[in-house]
Amino acid sequence: MGGPDPDVPDLDVPDPALLRQGYRAGRLEPEHLAPTWVEQFAAWFIDAATPGVGVPEANAAVFATASAAGRPSARTVLLKGFDQRGFVIYTNYASRKGREATENPFGSLVFPWYALERQVVVIGSIERVSRAETERYFQSRPHGSQLGAWASHQSTIIESRTVLDDRAAELAARWPEGTRVPTPEFWGGLRIVPDTVEFWQGRADRLHDRLRYRRVSVPADGGGTDSLAVADPDATGVRVGDAGGGDAGGGVPTAAEDLWVVERLAP
């Protein structure tokens, strides 16, 4: 109406619709996959964590949760462990993600390894790790990080940065360097127990490769036919074993075992 608003800075903002990246780093076929999702994740994690590949924090992932009412939230977290049971992170249980993990114990992790043109998407349930696991990890943390866990009432509103700095100074006086810092009762680990683990490899013309390990429930009596029937007809393979590390060669699953299928998804 009267020209640009003088109160709005004249920024040279690139048009996001025109930003495009061609993906040509590799391809992913079923024959490239390891027998289990945990072995496949380990192989890709090694690639991402290799110095010089351009991934600054290979263990950084976006962790999405939702409230009991279904309102989502997401944040970047740091993976602190993984095995056939799932992926472990640590947090203040009173934080938003900690509360939502209790109210609605399902979530997702996305590992965005841009430099490799790869991502891994995990979807599953959330459980707390044992107190012993939490204690072991907390005592391995640097002294400053231990004090930080005590200092921050995560996700609460504070008046200023001074609140944190003053609290940290008080804690440093209480537990100086070299003193054992107790593990806060309100702080601990969360394990994301996967139901699906998708491995995504960028390809040309947006025709990306997406291969997903999906858990299929098997009755304890070994009657697996009905469970297999619900697998998608385009499943590219079947893995039998525990939640990522059992017998991949077949056999009758036991109550402690899971059946996994590998599926290709359209990009």
Curated annotation (Swiss-Prot):
State the Gene Ontology BP annotations: pyridoxine biosynthetic process
User: Which pathway does it take part in?
Assistant: Cofactor metabolism; pyridoxal 5'-phosphate salvage; pyridoxal 5'-phosphate from pyridoxamine 5'-phosphate: step 1/1; Cofactor metabolism; pyridoxal 5'-phosphate salvage; pyridoxal 5'-phosphate from pyridoxine 5'-phosphate: step 1/1
Q: Which SUPFAM superfamilies match?
A: FMN-binding split barrel
Whether Flavoprotein counts among this entry's keywords is: yes
Q: What is this protein called?
A: Pyridoxine/pyridoxamine 5'-phosphate oxidase
Listed binding positions for FMN are 75-80, 90-91, 96-97, 119, 154-155, 200, 210
Cofactor(s) listed in the protein's UniProt record: FMN
Molecular function (GO) terms for this protein are: FMN binding; pyridoxamine phosphate oxidase activity
Pfam families cross-referenced by the UniProt entry: PNP_phzG_C, PNPOx_N
| PANTHER family the UniProt entry points to | PYRIDOXINE-5'-PHOSPHATE OXIDASE, PYRIDOXINE-5-PHOSPHATE OXIDASE
Q: Which InterPro entries match?
A: Pyridox_Oxase, Pyridox_Oxase_CS, Pyridox_Oxase_N, Pyridoxamine_oxidase_dimer_C, Split_barrel_FMN-bd
Flavoprotein as UniProt keyword: yes
Q: What does this protein do?
A: Catalyzes the oxidation of either pyridoxine 5'-phosphate (PNP) or pyridoxamine 5'-phosphate (PMP) into pyridoxal 5'-phosphate (PLP).
| Organismal lineage | Bacteria, Bacillati, Actinomycetota, Actinomycetes, Frankiales
The reaction(s) annotated as catalysed by this protein in its Swiss-Prot or TrEMBL entry are:
pyridoxamine 5'-phosphate + O2 + H2O = pyridoxal 5'-phosphate + H2O2 + NH4(+); pyridoxine 5'-phosphate + O2 = pyridoxal 5'-phosphate + H2O2
Query: Family per UniProt?
Result: Belongs to the pyridoxamine 5'-phosphate oxidase family.
- Residues that bind substrate, according to the entry? 20-23, 80, 137, 141, 145, 206-208
Name the domain of life this protein comes from: Bacteria
Note accompanying the cofactor annotation: Binds 1 FMN per subunit.
Tell me its EC number(s), please: 1.4.3.5
Subunit-level organization:
Homodimer.
Q: Mind listing the UniProt keywords for this protein, alphabetically?
A: Flavoprotein, FMN, Oxidoreductase, Pyridoxine biosynthesis
